[in-house]
Amino acid sequence: PLSAADKTIIKHLTGSVRTNAEAWGAESLARLFATSPSTKTYFSKFNDFTANGKRLHGGKVLNAVADVTDHLDNLAVLHGTTLLVDPHNFPLLSQSLLVTLAAHLLALDKFLDEVAKALSSHYR
């Protein structure tokens, strides 16, 4: 689990994520769609796969990931009952995000792993 220190670091890093959300989000989505093309079906409301479309939607996705830093203690309930995030595809997205962000934000590996665990725990 995330320690109090981890949570503090994660919340601090959110500013960097938000500042670069469109660029990093677009790169992450492009990587996700290239490595796991079937994940496009989970983006049914998103049909603009142009560079600009990915940039804008990638920004929304990455900002949504940043938003969960305010809910680190109840991720499973939030995502399982309110946001309805598919727990099976989040690890694929988190891997794409990690590859994109690893050079800049190393602490996110642990954070994204905890998000994936929290999402999965709600469905057991």
Curated annotation (Swiss-Prot):
O2 binds at H57. InterPro entries: Globin, Globin-like_sf, Globin/Proto, Hemoglobin_oxygen_transport. Red blood cells (at protein level). PROSITE patterns: GLOBIN (PS01033). One of its GO terms (molecular function) is oxygen binding. Keywords: Heme, Iron, Metal-binding, Oxygen transport, Transport. Residues 1-124 form the Globin domain. The keyword Translocase does not apply. Heme b binds at H79. One of its GO terms (biological process) is hydrogen peroxide catabolic process. One of its GO terms (cellular component) is haptoglobin-hemoglobin complex. Involved in oxygen transport from gills to the various peripheral tissues. Belongs to the globin family. Hb 1 is a heterotetramer of two alpha and two beta-1 chains. Hb 2 is a heterotetramer of two alpha and two beta-2 chains. Hb 3 is a heterotetramer of two alpha and two beta-3 chains. This fish has three hemoglobins: Hb 1, Hb 2 and Hb 3. They all have a similar Bohr effect. This is Hemoglobin subunit alpha.
